[in-house]
């Protein structure tokens, strides 16, 4: 398992592992306000998420851990999060549970960021196999403020060592939510969450990380690994699979209303992407691959500089939309066109409510 974790990191660094599908942020326009009637200094990007304050609405999404070399990566990422006062998740902690010698590669995140928002991470297959006490163990491992329970059926199905049995997941998730005393987030890992899935869990979980198509595609990551091991790379057949991130945010929000926190991850690459994630109705954005590559290429300082520029872009976009708070972004007028418009029309999502209403209220409940 250690080597698999490192192979994942190497694939993400050196290979083209991004989805052939777009997150469809390019199909969203925030309507410009020539007269925003707002001082730039009065634009407040702070939010509270799972009981912790973030200086701006971004989480460094969980990526790695479980191999000795990944511990130093997580240490650097935690230092970035601490300096910027944003959230951070860890990669799947399955390896840390099975191998005590690599627990430190996860624990280092809380050591470096004692007061910040930290999300633990474990998969539904492991919770079904080991029971809800496993959730308690991974939360305790990083002294987490919230628990991300990831579902990655596509990745498991194409993975050499995968476990593609996805039966009974909703019941497992409900049992976990009753067991732990921190908020639980259902986390997709690159294929998105549909309205149908959101309906299954909206009365169970505290949040949904849509993990939409358009960013890192873990089926492709597994295809890279399969080729390296001389196996047929099945994952390439699913390089454009999934619900695009922009569509997933709207689908999930349509059925959960304002009852759950939504984290928009999947292909978030710029501050404008973050602004569109917020405008579509998410509470917060998540970014993984660009942060990983930046911290490895330029260290903590370079990564901090990069994310500060992201934050500046978001603040400018909020000013140009006439919004003094993140919450206001969900009700700014937007224009939706192209593939996203076609998706919404095919899925019966009312475009008038999407474009002119408060997208946090829900309309398909």
From Swiss-Prot:
The keyword Hydrolase does not apply. It catalyses: isopentenyl diphosphate = dimethylallyl diphosphate. Coiled coil: none annotated. Pfam families: FMN_dh. It is found in: Cytoplasm. Mg(2+) binds at residue 156. Substrate binds at residues 4-5, 92-94, 155. It comes from the Archaea. GO terms for biological process: isoprenoid biosynthetic process. Keywords: Cytoplasm, Flavoprotein, FMN, Isomerase, Isoprene biosynthesis, Magnesium, Metal-binding, NADP. One of its GO terms (cellular component) is cytoplasm. It is an enzyme of class 5 (isomerase). InterPro entries: Aldolase_TIM (IPR013785), FMN-dep_DH (IPR000262), IPdP_isomerase (IPR011179). FMN binds at residues 62-64, 92, 121, 187, 216, 267-269, 288-289. One of its GO terms (molecular function) is magnesium ion binding. Its EC number is 5.3.3.2. Its cofactor is FMN; NADPH; Mg(2+). Belongs to the IPP isomerase type 2 family. Homooctamer. Dimer of tetramers. Involved in the biosynthesis of isoprenoids. Catalyzes the 1,3-allylic rearrangement of the homoallylic substrate isopentenyl (IPP) to its allylic isomer, dimethylallyl diphosphate (DMAPP). NCBIfam families: IPP_isom_2 (TIGR02151). This is Isopentenyl-diphosphate delta-isomerase. It comes from Methanopyrus kandleri (strain AV19 / DSM 6324 / JCM 9639 / NBRC 100938). The lineage of its organism: Archaea, Methanobacteriati, Methanobacteriota, Methanomada group, Methanopyri.
């Amino acid at each position: 398992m250690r080597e698999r974790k490192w192979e994942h990191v190497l694939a993400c660094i050196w290979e083209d592992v991004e989805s052939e599908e777009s997150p469809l942020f390019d199909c969203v326009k925030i309507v410009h306000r020539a007269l925003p009637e707002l001082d730039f200094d009065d634009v407040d990007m702070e939010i509270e998420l799972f009981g912790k304050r973030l200086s701006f609405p971004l989480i460094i999404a969980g990526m790695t851990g479980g191999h000795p070399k990944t511990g130093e990566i997580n240490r650097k990422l935690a230092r970035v999060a601490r300096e910027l006062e944003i959230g951070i998740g860890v990669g799947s902690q399955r390896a840390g549970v099975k191998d005590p010698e690599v627990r430190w590669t996860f624990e280092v995140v809380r050591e470096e960021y004692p007061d910040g928002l930290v999300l633990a991470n474990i998969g539904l297959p492991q919770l079904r196999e080991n029971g809800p006490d496993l959730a308690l163990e991974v939360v305790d491992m990083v002294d987490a403020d919230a628990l991300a329970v990831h579902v990655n059926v596509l990745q498991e199905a194409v993975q050499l060592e995968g476990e593609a049995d996805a039966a009974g997941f909703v019941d497992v998730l409900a049992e976990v939510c009753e067991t732990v005393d921190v908020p639980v987030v259902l986390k997709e890992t690159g294929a998105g969450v549909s309205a149908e899935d959101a309906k299954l869990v909206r009365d169970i979980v505290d949040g949904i990380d849509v993990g939409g198509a358009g960013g890192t595609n873990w089926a492709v990551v597994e295809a890279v690994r399969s080729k390296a091991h001389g196996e047929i790379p099945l994952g390439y057949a699913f390089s454009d699979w999934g619900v695009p991130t922009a569509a997933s945010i709207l689908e999930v929000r349509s059925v959960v209303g304002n009852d759950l926190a939504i984290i928009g991850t999947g292909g978030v690459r710029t501050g404008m992407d973050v602004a569109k994630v917020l405008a579509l109705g998410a509470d917060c954005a998540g970014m993984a691959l660009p942060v990983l590559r930046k911290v490895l290429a330029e260290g903590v300082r370079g990564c901090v500089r990069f994310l500060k520029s992201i934050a500046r872009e978001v603040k400018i976009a909020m000013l140009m939309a006439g919004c003094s708070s993140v919450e206001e972004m969900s009700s700014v007028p937007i224009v939706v066109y192209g593939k996203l418009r076609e998706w919404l029309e095919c899925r019966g999502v009312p475009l008038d409510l999407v474009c002119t209403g408060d997208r946090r209220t829900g309309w398909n409940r």
